[in-house]
Amino acid sequence: MQYQLLINGVLVDGEGERQSVYNPATGEVILEIAEASPAQVDAAVLAADSAFAEWGQTTPKARAECLLKLADSIEQNALEFARLESQNCGKPLHCVINDEIPAIVDVFRFFAGAARCLSGLAAGEYLEGHTSMIRRDPIGVVASIAPWNYPLMMAAWKLAPALAAGNCVVIKPSEITPLTALKLAALAKDIFPPGVLNVLFGRGQTVGDVLTGHEKVRMVSLTGSIATGEHILRHTAPAIKRTHMELGGKAPVIVFDDADLDAAAQGVRTFGFYNAGQDCTAACRIYAQRGIYDALVEKLGNAVSSLKMGAPEDESTELGPLSSLAHLKRVTAAVEEAKALSHIRVITGGSQTEGKGYYFAPTLLADAKQEDAIVQREVFGPVVSITVFDDEDQVLRWANDSRYGLASSVWTQDVGRAHRLSARLQYGCTWINTHFMLVSEMPHGGQKQSGYGKDMSLYGLEDYTLVRHIMVKH
């Protein structure tokens, strides 16, 4: 298929510099795509601003019908989407088909229903002779920046609530992994009125900055790194735009001596290495109580070393490559820094694999200390550290000693302990005896430098609205 931008309901070629898109499993170029020019970014935003006058006044039913049509279209083209995502990201094809595509379809269907349930919280006479009511209205033009780790899923998380609430959107996928977003554009063209949804392609410095800084953009939604979030906040601060930030994580996984160690080890094997560890909620920072530390290290070593790396199209592949050569170099540097510490033990993995593609072996680093960079910084790869702790107070202090605040988990059979820690952990989500589980009905989002705002759930829908007070004198 031809990959084009969607601007004002028309598929067009980019007018900017051409960029190569790679297959990370082979390191080979898939194709080249031209970026949007500044004039095309301007045209997309102006089209969205013009379309908002009508789209923002449509009924929730009408918006829901469009979202349902898009969900149906994605479902009908599931295999093509999955193949594109697998080819462009290196994800195991069966994971995209069985895990990601159904979740993406569900997000659009959830927000189609949620659009029809959005309402204000109060109506009444709070002043004699006056009736007050609360409205939740759309914001206007939303600029959405999607990341490279889950390109289509993160696009869905941003598009569905924004469109459901009555906003118009200009979305820019990562220049590393744009193919599924551009495929989505081709489907959306015949579903939404012109200008309601616009899809651009390009780098942050050439397209993203022009988009987020445009005077007609009222809100910017980003999933990305802390550095990118800081840049966008500085860039948009003079205009005081509404912002929604999901900026990564370093999830603590606290395993107490009464936990089911087999379940914990298998949980980390699955939840720490899914998508090659390129997940903001990955179970990557393990704390094990002293009494079970050695046993858990052994179980984790066996579990992690059994992960099968391979070609994305192979049904038995559990771990694919990292998304880019640049990211492979970042992960390698982080692990080499950890390995240089005399107290770190490499239980398994620890290096790039031989051969083509951007593969890094699943890695378990034992005896990490709280102050180590491998514990404090997000690696965003198939790398898990494990640290011993003595008691509840110590591990709570260590778990919260992080600039991140997205996700965490506690593994214990003590219900009281689970409740105590979940109440005090400074994370947007805490799982008990599991990790990584997300559903459309529940909010996902962080605190501290992991950002603010919620994806999914009714809270996510509300983030794309303005609360307004209307008062009538009578």
Curated annotation (Swiss-Prot):
Family from the record: Belongs to the aldehyde dehydrogenase family. Gamma-aminobutyraldehyde dehydrogenase subfamily.
SUBUNIT field: Homotetramer.
GO BP annotations listed: L-lysine catabolic process; putrescine catabolic process
Gene: patD
Pfam family membership, one: Aldedh
Organism: Salmonella choleraesuis (strain SC-B67)
Entry EC number(s): 1.2.1.19, 1.2.1.-
Binding site residues for NAD(+): 146-148, 172-175, 209, 225-228, 280
Active-site annotation: 246, 280 (nucleophile)
Keywords tagged on the record: NAD, Oxidoreductase
Additional free-text comment from the UniProt record: 4-aminobutanal can spontaneously cyclize to 1-pyrroline, and 5-aminopentanal to 1-piperideine.
Gene3D superfamilies in UniProt: Aldehyde Dehydrogenase, Chain A, domain 1 (3.40.605.10), Aldehyde Dehydrogenase, Chain A, domain 2 (3.40.309.10)
Function: Catalyzes the oxidation 4-aminobutanal (gamma-aminobutyraldehyde) to 4-aminobutanoate (gamma-aminobutyrate or GABA). This is the second step in one of two pathways for putrescine degradation, where putrescine is converted into 4-aminobutanoate via 4-aminobutanal. Also functions as a 5-aminopentanal dehydrogenase in a a L-lysine degradation pathway to succinate that proceeds via cadaverine, glutarate and L-2-hydroxyglutarate.
Name the UniProt record assigns to this protein: Gamma-aminobutyraldehyde dehydrogenase
Top EC group: oxidoreductase
